[in-house]
C-alpha cells in the first residue's frame, strides 16, 4: 500500500539525515539524559537540535500507526533511534546521545498519537454520515 511505501521511504530519509552528513571520527558519547536542559532556554542551537530530534520522527510514528500492529507501534521509534545512536557510536559518525533517543522516541509517539486522533476523528465523522 501507499502507506508502506511512504514509511519505507521516510525511514531511508531518516537514516540518510542521521548518518550520511556526519564526519567519521572518534566515537563520542553523551549518556546524560536531559543534558541540554539548562541551556535549552538560552541557546538557540540547543533548542533547534532538540526540536529537530523530535520532529524528525513524527512522520515515522504516523506512518507506523497505519502499517504495523498497534502493540509494536510505540516500540519501533525507540528501537530505530537506539539503532541509529549505536551506529553513530560504532562508526564514530556524530555523537551517540541519550537525549537524541529520548527526543526521537517522543517524536515517534507524537506521530502515533496524531495519526490515532486524526483517523479516529475521520472514522467518527464517517460513521455519523
Task: Annotate each predicted stretch with a short phrase.
Residues 1-98, 109-129:
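Bulky hydrophobic segments
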